Regions:
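Long, low-complexity, compositionally biased intrinsically disordered regions
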Residues: 1-93
Length: 93
């Protein structure tokens, strides 16, 4: 089970580092919880990529990115997950 607390250990190191770079340089924009547990974001890379993430509490149920990467999880999804986790920390304070 992938969660907001453990997803970093479930992602290949190179993808994680690239996702962290995108997150750290504010490449994630338009982060929005469109309905409970349903998140969308735009991540600026070579182009702007649309990311969708479905969650149940802290559990990540599914994700989608319209980038051309054909691996299981891309750097854009990682960046969006970092943004969601950061957003949830700010809201819960």
């Amino acid at each position: 089970m992938i969660t907001l607390d453990n997803f970093e250990s479930c992602v290949p190191y190179r993808i994680l580092v690239r996702g962290e770079e995108y997150y750290d340089t504010d490449a994630v924009s338009e982060l929005e919880e469109t309905s409970p547990g349903e998140w969308t974001a735009t991540v600026e890379g070579t182009d702007d990529y649309n990311v969708e993430i479905s969650m149940n509490g802290k559990e990540v149920e599914s994700w989608y990115c319209d980038c051309p990467y054909d691996g299981e999880i891309c750097k854009h999804v990682v960046a969006a997950l970092l943004a969601i986790r950061d957003n949830n920390k700010r809201v819960s304070r």
